[in-house]
C-alpha cells in the first residue's frame, strides 16, 4: 500500500490526522495521505503536519463549467485563487465515483480534449477515474450511483489506444507529462486569456513550456512570449514553430489544446501523435464507425465540431482580453523538495475507491 484516501476528511479531527501523518512516515518514507475535502481553504488540511493532498473540487467545477459556458476566465481565476493558498499538491480531477462522468457533463463533447490538456498541465497532481479514459458516460441518479461505478470488461477496450480518440489523448498526455519536468515542478504564469482561448507557461530551470487551449469552434491564432530557445515543438501534433523576437506565433485548432516545448532542449522527449491531433482523420473514422454501429459514448469523436453547430444556439458574451505575459516573482518555481516531488505523480483511481494505485 502506497497511500490512503480519507473519505470526508473535512470532518476528521486534526489531531488524528497529525498522528496518522507521523505514523505513516514511520511505516514508509513516501507514504501518501489524501483527503476528500469539498470546499474551504485547502491549506488547512494540506501541510507538513496533516495530509499531503486533498481533492481539488474548486478546479473540478471550473474545468467543466468553464468549457460549457465558454468562459476561460473562470478557470484562470480558480487557478489564481488556489495559488494564493500556497504551494499545495492538490489532487486534480474531472470526475470521480461521486460526480457525473466528464463526458456526460460536457455540453460539447469536443471539449474533452482541452479539458484534459488542462488537467495534465495545470499545477497539481492529475488523476483519471477508471473508465473515463474511454469516454464512457455516467449520469448521477436520485437514489443510486450505480451508473457512475459500472463494471467494465477490460477486454472490450484492448485496442482503445489505437481506435478511441479519448484513450489516445489520455495516453499521450501521460507520456508528455512524464517527459516534461516543468509540468510537475514548474512555476505557473498566465500568458493570454479570453473567454475562448487560454495560454499559460510552466517555467523550470530556464526552460519554458507553453500550454494553449481553445474552446471555440474555429481555430485561433496566438502570439506568446517564449523561452530562450530558437524553436518550439507541439507535443501532440509534432508541429514546429520558430521563436521570433522572443515570441512564438501559433494556431490552436478548434476545440483543442497543445503543449509546446523547446525543441532540442529536452532529450527525453519523444513526439507523440494522437488521433485527436488529426481532426479530419478523426471525423472520417467517426463517420465510418457510426454508419455501421449504434453510437456509444466511447465511440464518439472528441473533435466533432458538427455537434456544436447542431446544438442549441447560445448567447456569446463580448470577448474580453487580458494581457498577462509578465511573470511575477511570486510565481518562482519550487525547489525539488519532497513536497514538490509529489507533483510528479499521476494518480489513477481504481475500481476500489479507497485505494490509490
Positions of the model-derived regions?
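Conserved small/polar residues in nucleotide/adenosyl-binding loops
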Residues: 353-355
